[in-house]
Amino acid sequence: MHNNGRMLGVIGGSGFYTFFGSDTRTVNSDTPYGQPSAPITIGTIGVHDVAFLPRHGAHHQYSAHAVPYRANMWALRALGVRRVFGPCAVGSLDPELEPGAVVVPDQLVDRTSGRADTYFDFGGVHAAFADPYCPTLRAAVTGLPGVVDGGTMVVIQGPRFSTRAESQWFAAAGCNLVNMTGYPEAVLARELELCYAAIALVTDVDAGVAAGDGVKAADVFAAFGENIELLKRLVRAAIDRVADERTCTHCQHHAGVPLPFELP
């Protein structure tokens, strides 16, 4: 493995529990916020060392509202990760975005409640979040064939799916995708000055958009399973397009602000 101090991170979503073949090592991490969802596996993709963490645990132990998001992001940064891809499953609120589509959102709407979504409970630290995703990492994915560039992802609390009225409300507000894990993952990355981009795989058309019985968990997992190898190939291809040196300044915004503690 390379040891260039420029490790990338990948946080796998539902059904995305492994990423590498052989030649890996596993790191058991502990953080001020507890342990992450699973041990972190480190392998190599092209010229990059990559740290992989399954968001929901190795066996999907954590539902979306219960994922230890703060521990996950802290553990990755403590390993030296500064750039993170977050593949995830999403429902479509746009009839033109059909199951199997891969979308790289550029905006986010938070409709969660009660999640631990900051490291800075004390001190005057306020994350710049107007553009929640790293433009440099987004470009690494949107430059790939067949990927949809842009869209607004609304993040709901879960673990239940949306009602028809909620889906129609989200769509009328201009949201294109609905998901359960994109927040607080994105804002915690920003607080830790990590570059972060979501890679959203559409698994279903949401209840308020399509006729029928609505979204069922079994159908979501089945659709993700059918497309998981495609998604992994896209993530690997995106990693190959990431520069060796981190050049993005968009996600580094704490300069001149006294932090209540040192970042790992």
From Swiss-Prot:
Regulation: Not inhibited by adenosine, potently inhibited by MT-DADMe-immucillin A.
Protein name listed in UniProt: S-methyl-5'-thioadenosine phosphorylase
Statement: the UniProt record of this protein carries the keyword Transferase: yes
Assembly notes: Homodimer.
Source organism of this protein record: Mycobacterium tuberculosis (strain ATCC 25618 / H37Rv)
pH dependence (record): Optimum pH is 7-7.5.
Annotated keywords: Glycosyltransferase, Purine salvage, Transferase
Gene Ontology cellular component terms for the protein in this record: cytosol
